[in-house]
Design a protein with these regions (language model features):
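Proteins that catalyze or organize thiol-disulfide redox chemistry
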Residues: 1-52, 59-106
Length: 106
């Protein structure tokens, strides 16, 4: 299941999560973000139960993007125990994306 993270649920769904969380910081107008959409959805299904995977629209949730210094998108931040532990930016293959997630959550 792909989550939608907002200022209203970020604390509960991401920072207080008992499992790792991958947040895809994106914008609707961003073409590389659109390219990564299906990859993120696939990873949400593949990592179900092991990690939460979801999106955070930077235009609608600027305070979150600013807090984590998101300046380029798509940006992917993996949180463990409420802290960012890995950040990577830009479009990539599903294989590379999966490897980065696996390395960060294991």
């Amino acid at each position: 299941m792909e989550y939608k993270f907002t200022v209203d649920n970020f604390e509960a769904e991401v920072l207080q999560s008992e499992i790792p969380v991958l947040v895809d910081f994106y914008a609707d107008w961003c073409n590389p973000c659109k390219m990564m959409g299906p990859v993120v959805a696939k990873m949400a299904a593949e990592f179900e139960g092991r990690a939460k995977v979801g999106k955070c629209n930077v235009d609608d949730n600027m305070t979150i993007a600013q807090k984590y210094r998101i300046s380029s998108i798509p940006a992917f931040v993996i949180f463990k125990n409420g802290e960012p532990v890995e950040t990577f930016v830009g479009a990539m293959s599903a294989t590379d994306f999966k490897k980065k997630i696996e390395q960060a959550i294991n």
